[in-house]
Amino acid sequence: MTPVRNQKDVEKAASRAIEALYGPEVKDIKVRVLLPFPNEHKQEGWDANVTFLSKGKQYTVDLLIDQEDGQITNARLIDMMTPL
């Protein structure tokens, strides 16, 4: 896989991961918060907070993305709700 160096690369990696986890019917994938991981001084990856819609529900997922190869090292569901 390709290195993930900036927000555009993170958006591509997050989109691929969300579609792999939740299926191709997801839409409106947005990276809401993007932080270096573990911190700014020794960055090894990205902590991305991502929202998207699927089957009438809005999901918020936290993804840890390795900077060197774009692998998702952790994916965690934060919230699932019916949008207003």
Model regions and ranges:
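Short, non-transmembrane alpha-helical segments in secretory-pathway proteins
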Residues: 1-35
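Generic low-complexity segments that are intrinsically disordered, proline-rich and/or Lys/Arg-biased
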Residues: 25, 37-39, 84
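A short, surface-exposed interaction/processing loop segment used at functional sites
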Residues: 62-84
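Generic alpha-helix signal with a bias toward terminal, lower-confidence helices
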Residues: 22, 30, 43, 75-77, ...
